[in-house]
Every structure is written in structure tokens, then in C-alpha cells.
């Protein structure tokens, strides 16, 4: 039986970042990735997906993302970068391994994937959110007779040619998908809970990272980060979204009250007939593998930083604000990955000395 010091569940940017910093500790580390190949959830992004920050603002630790020759790197460029990163640092990865359970043992944990099992003193959960897309439970959703697709499974606008399409969700994915679908659809409706907030044309995702930095500093100083101005939901005006604005497409209506067989109905009695709904309604953390530990509540685990409070030896990285400001982004996960690796090394050293 091989007993690893650390097993990292997940193979995307968060997993690679933690593994990079753990290289400096000479601990034995194994990454278990559910995907068939490297690249994390980026390889499931839609065909035209691009970052909304330049390559030099979209790197993980150690090796800067090479320039793509374009203002904003494409999905395929990001996937290639992550695969090359993995090879560059000779990170130990087994795939495809879909971890189904993490169970406590005297030595630490047994990490299960069907009838296979691995043993580790420490487990880092870095599975992200892609495998847990959210579609709100709304009246009439099952009665709607048209096409329903979550952004997790959206590929290209070709499937919506000539259709009356409703895009639900006011974030970056909603705006970007609306922009390209509106070029081929018969009509589009953009339904959002609140009016979308747009960044100025001359700024990009770097502003969001700078906001995250200010919030991180506030947390380190014991200040309340919720009192700081600016959020992370603002829509970045990438070229396709700017072009859609020029066509008058970026007009959002309030969210509807219910769905019908033919479309949607609002609280004021107005209704719209649509053939397809694109749910750009986000994701929740993919934590199903941790349910066996009894620590998952409301799709979260109680953490101090990234360390699970109720399970010694468990850390969670890259799930968003509750595991660190901007920790679900390429450049933003660096801080929490570094601190996580340091804490793990200290934890394992203390175990030996105990």
C-alpha cells in the first residue's frame, strides 16, 4: 500500500497551483483528475470562450502563460497552457479518476473511486464547480416544451439558428452567450434578477482581480470585506459584448415568474413565447465526494481560510469567495494555493513530531 502525504482531488488550475507549491516541500503528492486529459473545466467551455484578461494577468504560479498573440486568450490556449504546465513540473496525475468518496482512516484518509482506493495523510479538494451546474427550480420548468441548455453544456450558437431564445442570467457568461446567439437567433430575451452591471469599455478582468486583492488585504487585517466598493459580477466589455451593445442586444428584462409550455410569464401578466432557454445561472461547488465525511452543508464546508474546521487534514481550494477572494480564477488562486501548501507542510511536520 502506498501512503501519499497529499492527494489532491481535481486536476484544474487550483489543483495544479497547490501541487506546484507542494513541490518545494518534498512531500509525496498525487493528483486524481476525473477528466480524460489535462486542462480542467476549461476544455468544456463553449467554442468561442475567451478570458477577459490578457495572458500576463491569467497565469498560475511559477510559469507565466505564454502570449497567444491576441488581446484575450482563447479557451484552447488556456487548455494548452494548463497541459504544458502539468508536464513542465512533472506533476503526478492519474486520470480519469472520478473520486466518489473520501473516508477517514487512522493514517488520514482513504480516497475512493468506485472499487479503487488510494491512501493519504492529507486531502485537498480542488474539484471546482463545473460538475454541479445550477438551474433554479421554477414553476413550470418541467412543462416547458422547448430546448433547455445550461451554459456548462453550451457549445456554439449553431444549435439556436432561427429560434426564439431566452438567456437567463446577468453575468459574464450570460452576456457573452447572448452576444453570439443573438447573431443567429430569430429573437432573444435576456432575463436577469437585477440589471446587469457593466465595466467601462477600457477596463478588463484585471479590475476584478484588483478588487479581490483589496478584499484579501482587508481579510488579512481583520476588516470586513463586505463594506468595500465594487463586486465581482460586473460584465467585462469584451469585443463581442461591445458589438452586441452596438446592435441594441444588451437589453435585460426582469426575471420571469413562471415557465409555461410555450415560454415565460412575468408577474405583471406579460408573456413571451420562446423556443429555447439558455441557463447562464452559475454553478455550485462540486463536493459530492466529501459527503461521506459529513461536513457538507448548503454546498459548502466550514473553513478557516482553506482548512476544513471539522476534519483535520482536509483543505478546500478554488471554490470562490468562501475559500479566498478570486480563488476560482487562474491568477487569483495563487494566494490560497501558496498558503494551503504552507499549512499542509506544517500540519504534516507536526504529525511527525507528535
Where are these regions (language model features)?
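Histidine-centered active-site microenvironments of extracellular/periplasmic hydrolases
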Residues: 49
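Glycine-rich flavin
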Residues: 52-70, 219-221
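Glycine-rich loop at the start of a catalytic domain that most often binds anionic cofactors/ligands
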Residues: 46
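Flavin (primarily FAD) cofactor-binding/catalytic cores of flavoenzymes
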Residues: 2-11, 16-35, 39-41, 70-354
Amino acid at each position: 500500500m502506498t501512503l501519499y502525504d497529499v492527494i489532491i482531488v481535481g486536476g484544474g488550475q487550483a489543483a495544479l497551483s497547490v501541487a506546484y507549491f507542494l513541490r518545494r516541500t518534498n512531500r509525496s503528492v498525487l493528483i486524481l483528475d476525473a477528466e480524460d486529459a489535462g486542462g480542467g473545466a476549461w476544455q468544456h467551455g463553449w467554442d468561442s470562450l475567451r478570458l477577459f484578461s490578457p495572458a500576463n494577468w491569467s497565469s498560475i504560479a511559477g510559469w507565466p502563460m505564454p502570449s497567444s498573440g491576441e488581446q484575450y486568450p482563447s479557451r484552447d490556449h488556456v487548455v494548452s497552457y494548463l497541459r504544458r504546465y502539468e508536464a513542465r513540473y512533472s506533476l503526478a496525475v492519474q486520470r480519469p479518476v472520478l473520486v466518489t468518496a473520501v473516508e477517514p482512516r487512522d493514517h488520514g484518509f482513504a480516497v475512493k473511486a468506485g472499487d479503487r482506493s488510494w491512501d493519504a495523510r492529507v486531502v485537498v479538494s480542488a474539484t471546482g464547480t463545473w460538475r454541479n451546474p445550477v438551474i433554479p427550480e421554477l414553476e413550470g420548468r418541467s412543462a416547458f416544451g422547448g430546448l433547455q441548455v445550461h451554459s456548462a453544456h453550451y457549445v456554439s450558437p449553431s444549435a439556436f439558428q432561427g429560434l426564439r431564445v431566452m438567456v437567463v442570467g446577468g453575468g459574464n457568461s450570460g452576456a457573452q452567450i447572448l452576444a453570439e446567439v443573438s447573431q443567429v437567433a430569430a429573437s432573444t430575451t435576456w432575463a436577469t434578477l437585477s440589471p446587469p452591471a457593466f465595466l467601462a469599455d477600457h477596463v478588463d478582468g484585471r479590475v476584478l482581480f484588483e478588487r479581490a486583492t483589496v478584499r484579501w488585504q482587508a481579510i488579512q487585517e481583520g476588516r470586513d470585506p463586505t463594506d468595500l466598493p465594487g463586486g465581482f459580477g460586473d460584465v467585462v466589455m469584451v469585443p463581442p459584448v461591445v458589438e452586441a451593445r452596438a446592435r441594441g442586444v444588451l437589453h435585460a428584462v426582469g426575471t420571469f415568474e413562471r415557465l409555461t409550455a410555450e415560454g415565460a410569464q412575468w408577474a405583471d401578466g406579460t408573456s413571451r413565447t420562446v423556443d429555447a432557454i439558455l441557463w447562464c445561472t452559475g454553478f455550485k461547488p462540486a463536493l459530492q465526494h466529501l459527503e461521506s465525511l459529513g461536513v457538507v452543508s448548503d454546498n459548502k464546508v466550514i473553513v478557516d481560510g482553506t482548512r476544513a474546521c471539522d476534519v483535520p487534514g482536509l483543505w478546500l481550494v478554488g471554490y470562490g469567495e468562501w475559500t479566498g477572494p478570486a480563488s476560482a480564477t487562474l491568477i487569483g488562486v495563487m494566494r490560497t494555493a501558496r498558503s494551503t501548501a504552507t499549512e499542509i507542510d506544517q500540519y504534516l511536520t507536526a504529525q511527525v513530531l507528535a
